[in-house]
Amino acid sequence: MKKLQYIDRLTNQRVTESVCYEKTMTFLYSSKLGKRLSTLLSRSPILSRIYGWIQKRSWTRRKIPGFVKRNHINIKDFKKSLSEFSSFNDFFTRELLPEARPIAQGDNICVTPVDGAYLIYSNIAEFGEFVVKSKRFSLSKLLGDPRLVEKYASGSVVFARLALFDYHRFHFPVDCLPGPTRTINGYLFSVHPMALKDNFNIFCENKRTLTELKTEAFGDVLYLEVGALNVGSIIQTYKPGEKYSKGDEKGFFEIGGSTVIVLFQPGSVQFDADLLKNSRMGLETRCLMGQSLGRSLRE
């Protein structure tokens, strides 16, 4: 399997990503039998529910110390001690201390909404023409709403991929007034790069939720959470119609990998130069929640 590399934003160094369950992932996405099996698993919600149920059993706590050690997770960031987690899923949906993720300041600054690996595209229209294994990415399929497609078709898009070892709570990238969340039911294909290299439209096929954010600094912003392999549960903790500050929690994913997508209208945001540079090279940038994502272009 080709090693996945990304840029660590804190050090600006190229790093090889540690893949959880690497042998299993290689089998599922590099062999004919594995691909057939992964498709079966992704299309079966009952298997996802069973997996989720298992990870909520108390005996799964035994996996936590080894998982933390293998993935070099900083336990000093946690609100709870390792012994306080009731299950592996409880650990997976962990909360962090506020000081663990400082929020970039400035009314005209938007921030990264999750811990994860980021790809940034300033022009969705150009990205929409990208062909991945002869399959075009479709904004229309992703959003399922002609009004939203027209609104964001010439705007910008942020993809943030969360690995299994990441902190899995998602946050608002801007000061905003969020509307209600709309759910589009779908499958639970993996969003790991090994799966995306064959079909970027996985984002358009997976279960996902959409929330429109009203903002003063950036105009309207569209926020999507995309489920992935074994992630059937996207939990919203915010209240529609209440004002939130950037960095405030919006919700969390239950166990599995997942993705957050944020869309901006045309002429509303200038993304940070390092994120754009890395994305143009085809490299994800691994960021922590609350870091600067870009600045407003609106007066």
From Swiss-Prot:
The record's EC number reads 4.1.1.65
Q: Does the keyword Lipid metabolism apply?
A: yes
Q: Which GO terms describe its cellular component?
A: plasma membrane
Which free-text remark accompanies the cofactor?
Answer: Binds 1 pyruvoyl group covalently per subunit.
PTM characteristics? Is synthesized initially as an inactive proenzyme. Formation of the active enzyme involves a self-maturation process in which the active site pyruvoyl group is generated from an internal serine residue via an autocatalytic post-translational modification. Two non-identical subunits are generated from the proenzyme in this reaction, and the pyruvate is formed at the N-terminus of the alpha chain, which is derived from the carboxyl end of the proenzyme.
* Positions bearing Pyruvic acid (Ser): S258
**Which reaction is catalysed here?**
a 1,2-diacyl-sn-glycero-3-phospho-L-serine + H(+) = a 1,2-diacyl-sn-glycero-3-phosphoethanolamine + CO2
Its localization reads: Cell membrane
Q: Where is this site: Cleavage (non-hydrolytic)?
A: G257, S258
Describe its membrane topology: Peripheral membrane protein
Q: Which residues form the active site?
A: D115 (charge relay system), H171 (charge relay system), S258 (charge relay system), S258 (schiff-base intermediate with substrate)
| Family recorded in the similarity comment | Belongs to the phosphatidylserine decarboxylase family. PSD-B subfamily. Prokaryotic type II sub-subfamily.
Q: What is this protein called?
A: Phosphatidylserine decarboxylase proenzyme
Q: Which organism is it from?
A: Chlamydia abortus (strain DSM 27085 / S26/3) (Chlamydophila abortus)
